Amino acid sequence: MGDDANAKLFRERAGWWRNLFNSKTGYIQPRNADGSWKKVDFNIENDDDYVEGSGAQYLWMVPFDPAGLFEKLGGVEKATARMDRFFYGRDGSLAVTKAGYDHAELANEPSIASPWLYDFAGAPWHSRFSTPVVRCRTIVRS
């Protein structure tokens, strides 16, 4: 509140995710110290260079810049279609936990806030539909 210098600093830092977005693969990927991509033969199934997630799951971990992410993915319509593939299995059921490297894992940090990105894409009904299912499947009741 009123700290414009730090606000500017952190707004800029929040955009650093773009340094890890590989537009050739369409995923967030690790880089080497020299700036080259760590794996030239990137395979989404390989999670060796990620912590508790995959490139597909880390892609959506940009809650502070959804507009920028959607732009990188080719616009809101393409981003929404991609989110649909991320959250839903081929049979149309929600794929929100234990569904594989290319789907959400909402019991884990990299994916946990991703359903709300639909709100920023102008499709809030997706968030309202998925979050009760997520709550029932992933939150342990005491």
Question: Predicted segments — roles?
Answer:
Residues 1-142:
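Active-site core of glycosidic bond-cleaving carbohydrate-active enzymes
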